């Protein structure tokens, strides 16, 4: 294949996905289903605690065949989803660049950039310094052989993922199909006056679950929101910082920094039984409760028009976690079936632990 081949005719060997360590089983099941939907024939490979899973096809396939199924937003437990085209298990210690360059050149695809990364595990993250140091020399060698055209529109980004010091996966980051952050992890700083780290969870949910256009149009100053189970106020504070007036529902206290925004009304009430007198733009919820109960409550608020949009968190059981997510999907589907089409997006965020975060709204 010519090195001038367009990305659409580029052949790949499957899908590579990153996840939170410990959720490889759930991720593997999801990408196995994605591969089946895309008509791929092959198998999933993963190891417990590795922080990633891969689907490997029996024969290379054109990347265009993956189509919409290669979109990182689809699998709940994937932080990143990439078509991969080669891998190596015996990288030499001294000249790691040469075999990697040869594999990239052999793929017949040019790339517009290079991202070196590791799985998000304590062991693998020890190689983050190596990735930073190795990026420049690898970039230089790829440019020498014509495999890299930095910033060239239409070319994918080369991802090189090192699960160990001597092994690597080579994958292609397709525009608008892969997560835009290295390792699929948004870099967020904890604001000094935020009441709790949970504020980062809502900030990441807004970054991850909403598009740029949706963030601009759906989160405007002057809107009204409700936060169910608000204490100590991390999610309420995040909304208030965006100029949104919040009614915070919780029998527990809110931090002084939350009330200092002067954008918050705190009502001591039960988040499951309280209802607003008139509809609001947003309802958010991070209550610790069975996921099915939360999902039913969220669907009820949307179905009755009490809110237009909701972002909520689902705490997962230790076992059958993917099944719990699917049960929540079905509960929401049944409640909204007679109301109209809806948009439900679910992701396990970097700031989620044994949980996932979701966005729900009715489609216009």
UniProtKB/Swiss-Prot annotation:
UniProt keyword terms in alphabetical order: Cytoplasm, Methyltransferase, rRNA processing, S-adenosyl-L-methionine, Transferase
Coiled-coil annotated spans: none
GO cellular component labels: cytoplasm
Record flagged with keyword Methyltransferase: yes
Protein localization: Cytoplasm
Name of a matching Pfam family: FtsJ
Biological processes per GO annotation: methylation; rRNA processing
Subunit structure as annotated in this protein's UniProt entry: Monomer.
Record's protein name: Ribosomal RNA large subunit methyltransferase M
Taxonomic placement: Bacteria, Pseudomonadati, Pseudomonadota, Betaproteobacteria, Rhodocyclales
Gene: rlmM
